[in-house]
Regions:
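FAD-dinucleotide binding site
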Residues: 1-459
């Protein structure tokens, strides 16, 4: 039956890459450099995937609805930043949390909490591992709460289900890269990916096809047939290739047949399905408010305002939107709110108006600014519910209890014909990061090139 389908393919390339996020672009670049014909298919009308830089003309800075920070010394990413002739700017270092009704330095408690997360071991729920660690120890209540707050917010994980071993591996890898040193890319993350795309198109003009929704990947050893349609529903010509690099997010890989964005593989990939089921795409919700002025710094100078000078991050454990950050060192009236894990799921279930209200309530509690003042100062907003996005279905991969080793399975080539990339396939502790995604794209391209060269030698 599969052989019958090849006759109707009207378009042929060496390799088809599914997904034009960081992993897909990195893979396409490597393949194009090797002088292979490449087709890069992207369901969205833009590149970037979970990198979603917006540059609204009436906002004072570029804004990120997706990935935003360069975490520590990520060599692969920083090399690409330099190649694109961009710069990274450290964020505001001051991190405060609401404690006993006032904003206080969170650093001492946060350092202790993060150190504890870095020692997590065992394929048991994070909550269980933390409780075992804390049993008999005199740990301040704030530090105990911050450990859980950090895992749920930063890793988008449910502490009752996520594997302590997996979270510990991620945190130890982050610390090795000085991941607590956050910076932004001047002009936005998208600039790096645009530079990669220009490299692809220089070697493979016309490789990128946007608004192209892949619906089916039929494969046999050494051959792939891809079916796709436009976002409007219009069926596109079938595409035949010698190999495919699949870079769709874990959430899309897990999507049930018939769901928006889901891709059918024929024959089915049973090992991939089982491995994907052992992980989840952690929920994330991100919102940005543009205020007429930086209200947290305005008004008559007081000791309170002095504490907020140079503010980078503010935390409200227990709040509906518990994490906020400024654009420091750039001064503006823009605040970004972030919720991960169960809190993101709660926000996702609410109407937009109620979500906005919950977010403003959180800011009122944090800064003591009356709700009416916040509403009067609010000029614009942007929000993105990543779990409701059919081409993401969440923020980034979280390994559940019983899922250790799943990423290794997801990264494994199939019949030297299907190759997989994306942050969920990372096995070096860099899952959930742009640099991890870039590195997996490069790895999948190397694997694909090696397989194609071996085929050529075997003829």
């Amino acid at each position: 039956m599969l052989e019958d389908r090849w006759a109707v393919a009207v378009d042929r390339v060496d390799v088809v890459v599914v997904g034009a996020g960081a992993a897909g672009l990195a893979a396409a670049e490597q393949l194009a450099r090797a002088r292979l014909s490449v087709r890069l298919l992207e369901a969205r009308p833009r590149i970037g995937g979970r990198v979603d830089t917006r540059r609204p003309p009436d906002w004072p800075v570029p804004v990120e609805l997706g990935a935003e920070f360069v975490q520590g010394k990520a060599r692969t990413l920083l090399a690409r930043v330099r190649k694109a002739r961009l710069r990274v700017e450290p964020t505001g270092e001051k991190r405060l949390t609401l404690k006993d009704g006032r904003l206080s330095d969170v650093a001492p408690s946060l350092h202790g909490a993060l150190a504890r997360v870095a020692t997590l071991h065992g394929d048991v729920p994070v909550e269980q591992a933390l409780e075992a660690m804390e049993r008999g120890e005199k740990i301040p209540a704030e530090e105990r709460a911050l450990s859980r707050f950090y895992v749920e917010g930063y890793y988008a994980a449910d502490v009752t289900r996520a594997s302590a071993e997996a979270i510990g591996v991620l945190e130890r890898a982050s610390r090795a890269l000085h991941g607590d040193e956050a910076a932004r890319i001047e002009g936005g993350y998208l600039g790096v990916l645009e530079d990669i795309l220009s490299s692809v198109e220089k070697r493979a003009p016309g490789a990128l096809r946007l608004s192209t929704v892949v619906t089916e990947v039929r494969w046999s050893a050494s051959r792939v047939l891809v079916e796709s349609r436009k976002a409007t529903g219009l069926a596109l010509p079938q595409l035949e290739a010698r190999a495919a690099v699949i870079t769709i997010p874990l959430g899309v890989l897990r999507a049930p047949a018939g769901a928006a964005g889901a891709i059918r593989f024929a024959p089915r990939l049973h090992d991939v399905e089982r491995a994907a089921a052992a992980m989840v795409q952690g929920p994330l919700f991100k919102l940005l408010f543009r205020f007429r002025e930086a209200f947290w710094r305005s008004g008559t100078p007081t000791a309170h305002h002095a504490r907020l000078r140079g503010l980078g991050f503010a935390f409200l454990p227990g709040g509906a939107v518990p994490t906020w950050w400024t654009t420091a060192p750039v001064e503006s009236g823009v605040l970004t709110g972030w919720a991960g894990g169960p809190l993101a799921q709660e926000l996702s279930a609410l109407p937009a108006e109620i979500r906005r209200g919950r977010a403003l309530d959180s800011l009122q509690k944090l800064f003591g600014t009356p709700r009416s003042t916040l509403e009067e100062l609010l000029e614009d907003e942007l929000m993105h519910d990543w779990q409701a996005d059919p081409y993401a279905r969440g923020g980034y991969a979280v390994t559940q209890v019983g899922g250790l080793g799943a990423a290794r399975v997801l990264a494994r080539p199939i019949a030297d014909t299907l190759f997989f990339a994306g942050e969920h396939t990372d096995t070096e502790g860099q899952a959930g990061t742009v640099h991890g995604a870039l590195e997996t794209g490069e790895r999948a391209a190397r694997e694909c090139l090696a397989a194609l060269r071996e085929r050529a030698r075997a003829r």
